Amino acid sequence: MTKLTLYPGTFDPITNGHLDLIKRSAAMFEHIIVAVAASPSKNTLFTLDERVQLVQEVTQDLPNVSVEGFSGLMVDFARQKQANLLVRGLRTTMDFEYEFGLTSMYRKLMPELESVFLTPSEEYAFLSSTIVREVALHGGSVEAFVPSVVNQALIHKVKSPV
């Protein structure tokens, strides 16, 4: 059975860790939709459209990866796309506990949606969008942690916040 796979997240911004997970997933699964969540409850630095555009730019060389923004419940988006597999990254035991709770809820809301968890490559185990944003907002360099187009977008956003 062909699996349509979702990799959901806020991606504010997308990091090298996210990109590593996308590339590894693209090598394992037929098609990946990177599902960029609107996340209205989060105070995002980039708009949904900006985040979708950045993810599209950094994944354009991956032919079996597409990028879409969505709002509302992730399971509703998965159902709309007829996805039956969800990829999530796990860095820490805190991530595991959070994801375990989400997976339990997803099973109740959409039993046919399976979850696959990937651990990060060692060099990205500490990396998060929150840390990247904080460092950038305080004037630190994040070029080692994000693709260059994202680094430039962060520099621009921090210098002229909207």
From Swiss-Prot:
Catalytic activity: (R)-4'-phosphopantetheine + ATP + H(+) = 3'-dephospho-CoA + diphosphate
Enzyme class, first EC level, given as a word: transferase
Subunit structure: Homohexamer.
Residues binding ATP: 10-11, 18, 89-91, 99, 124-130
Site (Transition state stabilizer): 18
GO cellular component: cytoplasm
Any Gene Ontology biological process: coenzyme A biosynthetic process
SUPFAM superfamilies: Nucleotidylyl transferase
Function: Reversibly transfers an adenylyl group from ATP to 4'-phosphopantetheine, yielding dephospho-CoA (dPCoA) and pyrophosphate.
Species name: Aliivibrio salmonicida (strain LFI1238)
Predominant localisation class: cytoplasm
EC number(s) on file: 2.7.7.3
MF terms in GO: ATP binding; pantetheine-phosphate adenylyltransferase activity
Binding-site residues, substrate: 10, 42, 74, 88
UniProt xrefs under NCBIfam families: coaD_prev_kdtB, cyt_tran_rel
Cofactors: Mg(2+)
Protein's UniProt keywords contain Nucleotidyltransferase: yes
Xref: HAMAP family: PPAT_bact
Family: Belongs to the bacterial CoaD family.
Keywords (A to Z) from UniProt: ATP-binding, Coenzyme A biosynthesis, Cytoplasm, Magnesium, Nucleotide-binding, Nucleotidyltransferase, Transferase
PANTHER family (UniProt xref): PHOSPHOPANTETHEINE ADENYLYLTRANSFERASE (PTHR21342:SF1)
Protein's cellular compartments: Cytoplasm
Alphabetized InterPro entries for the sequence: Cyt_trans-like, PPAT, Rossmann-like_a/b/a_fold
Name by which UniProt lists this protein: Phosphopantetheine adenylyltransferase
Pathway(s) served: Cofactor biosynthesis; coenzyme A biosynthesis; CoA from (R)-pantothenate: step 4/5
